[in-house]
Amino acid sequence: MSGDMEAKIWGSTQISVKEFCYEWTISNFSFCMGGIRRKIKSPVFSLVANEEVAWCLRVHPNGFDEESKDYLSVYLVLVNCPKRQVRAKFEFWIKNSQGEKYQYTQSLNVPSFQRKQNWGFSKFILRDSLLSHRNWLLPKDKLTLCCKVSIVGAILNMPGQNMIPAIKDPRHMLTDDLGKLWENPLFTDCSLLVAGHEIRAHKAILAARSPVFRAMFEHQMEERLANCFEIQELDFQVFKEMMDFIYTGKAPTLHSHSMACDVLAAAEKYGLEGLKVICEDSLCRNLSVENAAHTLIVADLHSTEQLKTRALHFIAVHASEVSKSSGWKSMVESHPHLVDERFHSLASAQSVFLESSFKCLKGF
């Protein structure tokens, strides 16, 4: 049988999905702190007015349980539903002072909600990370939490002859479009020399994102006239991660402790507060016995108080193990003030347990 004569039998299965986004603003957020399991509920909301399927958000500022006591816990709650259950995927993020998404987190699967049941994230964001960057994440003491809900609806099977070609959604994300400018050197107007590599870039984007780049372009220097600028003391890969953040706002690939530290240093050098927060949060999440001392040095060097507090607390809790690490021994020799001053001030404000832990460290 020839190809033209073959019968082509095909069909399509369409799973209906309804999506909506809910934005919840909590004013005077700093007054919401309390004990573990203390919760705040949002107003009840629905996809459309008077719909029987109703939801609300729930926040635990001090964590849902003992394990998550250092975090902000967030949940999506099914308040009412006429059916036995609803399957829905959900996404959470914080809207920062610039209107950008921060701490974007989504469900890995599509859980089933029953009436009064909730799903969410017990360790959504470190509370210290949130509070230590108030101007960026809590402008005017307001937390703006966003949740996108995708509800699974009916499953419809359709034969091929009845199929209507789907119209592609023409919308594009701004970050994706700017990312294309970063990937393609078209219309660039300056060159950046980094560790023997030349990178083409756009002055307007760099100046808008970084006050350091803006000042560099404004000054009447020979490099400016030639539109060629040498970037010193930065690793090429670190610089690429920083530039990717400048163009897209997306979190960098921090595949190691040293990379997170190097990108943090670059973020501070070029005035990128958002990138600095991301690196700080990554270092907090990945504290270990081996890197705790070096993390403390980095925190002290770059004046990141939240990271310093977390590192000091980690060292206090794991005093005997940290004191045996090579990083601790190196820190005692190179940064004795962190032992003599910071540890002493922290121990005086902590419990007897912490004081005894630091005595162990001081006597090492």
UniProtKB/Swiss-Prot annotation:
Q: Which family does it belong to?
A: Belongs to the Tdpoz family.
In its UniProt entry, what is this protein called? TD and POZ domain-containing protein 2
Organism encoding this protein: Mus musculus (Mouse)
PANTHER family per UniProt: SPECKLE-TYPE POZ PROTEIN
Q: What region holds the MATH domain?
A: 19-149
Question: Taxonomy-wise, where does this protein's organism fall, top ranks first?
Answer: Eukaryota, Metazoa, Chordata, Craniata, Vertebrata
Q: Where is the BTB domain?
A: 188-255
The superkingdom of the source organism is Eukaryota
Please give a single GO biological process term from the UniProt record: protein catabolic process
